[in-house]
């Protein structure tokens, strides 16, 4: 009995779906089966949405976000506070902060973090354009909203050193106990950060 359980067309669909983040082989098979079962209502609209996205989505020349316009919708929004610049690693991080509804300023997407082990240096990231934006004036605070990883913190220190002479306040996101978090389930590093960043009650 052969290993193949379906034709090459379905195998190709599964292979492509498995390349998406968060989808392993099993999840890709489930997604493929769902698409096949609902092909009349999903395949056409999905293919059209993907074609339109491929043809119209661009990176914002100001902040690095992705959108169908350049500058992006966020950079064009005059209700945003132009004096606060939130620096993030990825567009996914930008979207996560936007979902929180807490950001009133504008963004700058670095496109990753400094990682010597992976061969990622300053020239591989959107750091020079960040320095240009801050140096142009009008920004009073730079919020370094990078991940609390070694590479993330290395990147934050590097950026801080570069903008330290530009007379802007540099802050970072607080680290510690998440809302609804139980202390017994938190790692030692998170607990230590929470203790260092404690506030009056």
From Swiss-Prot:
CDD domains (alphabetical): TOPRIM_recR
Start and end residues of each Toprim domain: 83-178
Zinc-finger ranges (C4-type): 60-75
Pfam families from the UniProt entry: RecR_C (PF21175), RecR_HhH (PF21176), Toprim_4 (PF13662)
InterPro entries: DNA_Rcmb_RecR, Rcmb_RecR, Rcmb_RecR_Znf, TOPRIM_dom, TOPRIM_RecR
Keywords for this protein: DNA damage, DNA recombination, DNA repair, Metal-binding, Zinc, Zinc-finger
HAMAP family: RecR (MF_00017)
Function, as annotated: May play a role in DNA repair. It seems to be involved in an RecBC-independent recombinational process of DNA repair. It may act with RecF and RecO.
Protein family per UniProt: Belongs to the RecR family.
Designated name of the protein: Recombination protein RecR
Lineage, top ranks: Bacteria, Pseudomonadati, Pseudomonadota, Alphaproteobacteria, Hyphomicrobiales
């Amino acid at each position: 009995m052969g290993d193949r359980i379906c034709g090459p067309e379905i195998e190709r669909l599964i292979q492509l779906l498995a390349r998406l983040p968060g989808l392993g082989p099993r999840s890709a098979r489930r997604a493929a089966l769902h698409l096949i079962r609902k092909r009349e209502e999903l395949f056409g609209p999905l293919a059209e949405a993907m074609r339109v996205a491929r043809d119209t989505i661009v990176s914002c020349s100001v902040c690095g976000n992705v959108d169908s316009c350049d500058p992006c919708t966020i950079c064009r929004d005059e209700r945003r506070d132009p004096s606060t610049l939130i620096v993030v690693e990825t567009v996914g991080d930008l979207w996560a902060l936007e979902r929180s509804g807490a950001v009133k300023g504008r963004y700058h997407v670095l496109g990753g973090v400094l990682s010597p082990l992976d061969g990622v240096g300053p020239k591989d990231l959107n750091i020079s354009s960040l320095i240009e934006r801050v140096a142009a004036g009008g920004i009073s605070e730079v919020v370094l909203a990078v991940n609390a990883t070694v590479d993330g913190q290395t990147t934050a220190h590097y950026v801080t050193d570069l903008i330290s002479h530009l007379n802007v306040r540099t802050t970072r996101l607080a680290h510690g106990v998440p809302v609804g978090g139980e202390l017994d389930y938190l790692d030692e590093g998170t607990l230590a950060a929470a203790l260092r960043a404690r506030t009056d009650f």
